[in-house]
Amino acid sequence: MVVGDFPIETDTLVIGAGPGGYVAAIRAAQLGQKVTVVEKATLGGVCLNVGCIPSKALINAGHRYENAKHSDDMGITAENVTVDFTKVQEWKASVVNKLTGGVAGLLKGNKVDVVKGEAYFVDSNSVRVMDENSAQTYTFKNAIIATGSRPIELPNFKYSERVLNSTGALALKEIPKKLVVIGGGYIGTELGTAYANFGTELVILEGGDEILPGFEKQMSSLVTRRLKKKGNVEIHTNAMAKGVEERPDGVTVTFEVKGEEKTVDADYVLITVGRRPNTDELGLEQVGIEMTDRGIVKTDKQCRTNVPNIYAIGDIIEGPPLAHKASYEGKIAAEAIAGEPAEIDYLGIPAVVFSEPELASVGYTEAQAKEEGLDIVAAKFPFAANGRALSLNETDGFMKLITRKEDGLVIGAQIAGASASDMISELSLAIEGGMTAEDIAMTIHAHPTLGEITMEAAEVAIGSPIHIVK
């Protein structure tokens, strides 16, 4: 401790105010804790400021532009449809600003103290918080680390004005004429699709056999087909990016496919090959917190580290880097600190891709269930047999419901189709609530809605489908 530096005491110190940190702080405050949040950048973290929210705003804008140009089959013809990309970016920023202001209001309303700066552990009960002009020591009874992650930088692709990470891609001032995306996961596919809808010529380089490798092949193949149908998208699988040559007006990317070296010229190259946990500048070694070789913090089922009063949540612990996973873990950690018997259960946590069509998955896939030796029923229902999907002109896709054969218990679901991101929540509820396929089939769903697809898939699972022939 620096001479003259009087420490400020708090019950629970939260490091990071992203979707995990600010939720943890609010829940801890609700449970009677005096809470302090330390945030080095902007409230809301990556998700709200340079991730989930702005990317979905950009995707929505691109989708609307695409629809305006291609609704001839409905009798709608629009001429001279144009994009003012400056206004698109201004609108996107307004969405973000409303939400960051909302987070600030929620923290204030719950009497959470917010401190700007970077926290560094001194010991297991104190941190040093530093900003540009000062430093202050904070002591705590418990701490929750929620510092998130950052994009991985490839050795031969150093970030610059032309070599972008996801943050840079969201901040472009112009619509690229041509964009190369390295990595066909959910981030690359979402951002690539958004720009392709604005008219950008898109080239995706994916190292695996399929884009979106975390999803079943039948699902990712639907997305691949829709992308290629646009006419301005190339997808190279089993491709290895080798290097980039930058010019003032663009880049030349070198890559290899099946031993053959190729090049492609573009305005920009976007790198989306994963994210790295932000655990390397916190002084975790000062308190002996155990981590993996990848910098992932080891935790138990209450998000507690090996140091009993220090917890970790979100992208810095095991599991997919999902905002809603971090928020869930934040609540669990706050409740554990308060002495409540809360434990994490990841089976009901969904994963979503805002592609075309959207993809969503929760619980077991058919392959995973079979690998574990489970006796299951995998029931499918197509979007093309649903009235609402037809009226929306969104007939690509299907729902697959995974149930346990012995009792019909819902243990998983996959959706490829319009509004899959909204539909998956009912299946998460089914898993969390221990519901059976019969429970869903007997639940009255409004007509005509996409939600009926869930009911229809459940009817298939119990052997009594109405709108498809057995």
From Swiss-Prot:
Q: Which cofactor does it need?
A: FAD
User: Any signal peptide, and if so, which residues?
Assistant: none
The catalytic activity of this protein is classed by the Enzyme Commission as 1.8.1.4
- What does the UniProt cofactor note say? Binds 1 FAD per subunit.
What InterPro entries would the database entry show?
Class-I_Pyr_Nuc-Dis_Oxidored, FAD/NAD-bd_sf, FAD/NAD-binding_dom, FAD/NAD-linked_Rdtase_dimer_sf, Lipoamide_DH, Pyr_nuc-diS_OxRdtase, Pyr_nucl-diS_OxRdtase_dimer, Pyr_OxRdtase_I_AS
Q: Where is the active site?
A: H447 (proton acceptor)
Where does it sit, as one GO cellular component term?
cytoplasm
Q: Where in the cell is it found?
A: Cytoplasm
Q: Which domain of life is it from?
A: Bacteria
Binding residues for FAD: E39, K40, A41, T42, L43, G44, G45, V46, C47, K56, A119, D315, A323
Gene Ontology terms, MF aspect:
dihydrolipoyl dehydrogenase (NADH) activity; flavin adenine dinucleotide binding; NAD(P)H dehydrogenase (quinone) activity
- Gene3D superfamilies annotated for this entry? 3.30.390.30, FAD/NAD(P)-binding domain
Q: Indicate which residues the UniProt annotation says bind NAD(+).
A: G183, G184, G185, Y186, I187, E206, T272, V273, G274, R275
Q: Which UniProt keywords apply?
A: Cytoplasm, Disulfide bond, FAD, Flavoprotein, NAD, Oxidoreductase, Redox-active center
Pfam families per the record? Pyr_redox_2, Pyr_redox_dim
The reactions it catalyses are: N(6)-[(R)-dihydrolipoyl]-L-lysyl-[protein] + NAD(+) = N(6)-[(R)-lipoyl]-L-lysyl-[protein] + NADH + H(+)
**Disulphide-bridged cysteine pairs:** C47-C52
User: What does the annotation say about its assembly with partners?
Assistant: Homodimer. Component of two multienzyme complexes: pyruvate dehydrogenase complex and oxoglutarate dehydrogenase complex.
The UniProt record's further free-text remark is: The active site is a redox-active disulfide bond.
Q: What does this protein do?
A: Catalyzes the oxidation of dihydrolipoamide to lipoamide.
The entry assigns this protein to a family as follows: Belongs to the class-I pyridine nucleotide-disulfide oxidoreductase family.
Q: What is this protein called?
A: Dihydrolipoyl dehydrogenase
Please give the organism.
Bacillus subtilis (strain 168)
